[in-house]
Amino acid sequence: MRTPMSDTQHVQSSLVSIRSSDKIEDAFRKMKVNETGVEELNPYPDRPGERDCQFYLRTGLCGYGSSCRYNHPTHLPQDVAYYKEELPERIGQPDCEYFLKTGACKYGPTCKYHHPKDRNGAQPVMFNVIGLPMRLGEKPCPYYLRTGTCRFGVACKFHHPQPDNGHSTAYGMSSFPAADLRYASGLTMMSTYGTLPRPQVPQSYVPILVSPSQGFLPPQGWAPYMAASNSMYNVKNQPYYSGSSASMAMAVALNRGLSESSDQPECRFFMNTGTCKYGDDCKYSHPGVRISQPPPSLINPFVLPARPGQPACGNFRSYGFCKFGPNCKFDHPMLPYPGLTMATSLPTPFASPVTTHQRISPTPNRSDSKSLSNGKPDVKKESSETEKPDNGEVQDLSEDASSP
């Protein structure tokens, strides 16, 4: 005859055995065996009474490690197959569109969408020399074909061919031939320059085209940049471009086709910067292509860094120069400018500092300030300032005008 005490002891012993078996089973579950046969314990804490760590359930990792206060179950759900240094596969979840477009995911293992391995988009994407993706199965990017750049960058889903194979028709730009240019060390340089047609500019300004750098040729992937030098003219009223012929060629191409009418007021943006972002559609007047060359500098020019994957520098893309120089954190692609001739030999680094500025008109006085305010210099008056008399001596007309 069993006593009640013996029954309770039997029940307690059975419960203890069940608990011990559960603990043993949990211990086997926690223990992982790798390929070498050595056991590996779960590096994250197991807290049965706490909530499950959502970050661990999504990615299989936890940034807090052993200090996390949530539970980290040993067996992850079946729809999460995480591999170290790879993007997670989440079967049943929508496909990650960013991953299908670029082959990468900026969210990494924290992305909650599915990243299939057998998709074509998961393969490494080829990039052109500017840093834009080339997708042979997609149609060409219309914005890239017009402007030569793409504001979406690596996230664009369209095809971006190589610049020497593409055609850019923005602001009258056409396709650009390739030339064989080399460094002084013998390395082949990416050449996308052609011959520059003579721009139509007022007679008061003589454009002088020089090599992209007045001391050395920049390496491939770096854009030419000339350090700012002192100019004898006001920057606001007479903006000049850097010593880079690439920026000067860009200015000539951008200003090509701008309307010049005396009936309309002057375009303030054009007067301040020398270019107009509206192009032919601008309704204001653009008084000539104002390009002046700064005095030559004996300091070697700096170069702007090319940072593929970063947004393009707005100043460099619009005007051809960057005020931040080599410290700029944005991308400065070596864009192909049409009509640019680059010197194949290195110029002398120590040039003569005694040079004359390219402006041939004298300093304006009060009498001709009215003509200059309209943006059109009085060519007739400037040409009649000096004349040669019969005796060969130079006669100043200003003295004759003051005499009775």
UniProtKB/Swiss-Prot annotation:
GO terms for molecular function: DNA binding; mRNA binding; nuclease activity; zinc ion binding. InterPro entries: Plant_ZF_CCCH, Znf_CCCH, Znf_CCCH_sf. Possesses RNA-binding and ribonuclease activities in vitro. A zinc finger (C3H1-type) spans 47-75, 90-118, 135-163, 261-289, 307-335. Its EC number is 3.1.-.-. Residues 350-404 are annotated as: Disordered. SMART domains: ZnF_C3H1. Residues 377-391 have a biased composition (Basic and acidic residues). The lineage of its organism: Eukaryota, Viridiplantae, Streptophyta, Embryophyta, Tracheophyta. One of its GO terms (cellular component) is nucleus. It is found in: Nucleus. This is Zinc finger CCCH domain-containing protein 3. Keywords: DNA-binding, Hydrolase, Metal-binding, Nuclease, Nucleus, Repeat, RNA-binding, Zinc, Zinc-finger. The keyword Kinase does not apply. The keyword Kinase does not apply. Residues 350-374 have a biased composition (Polar residues).
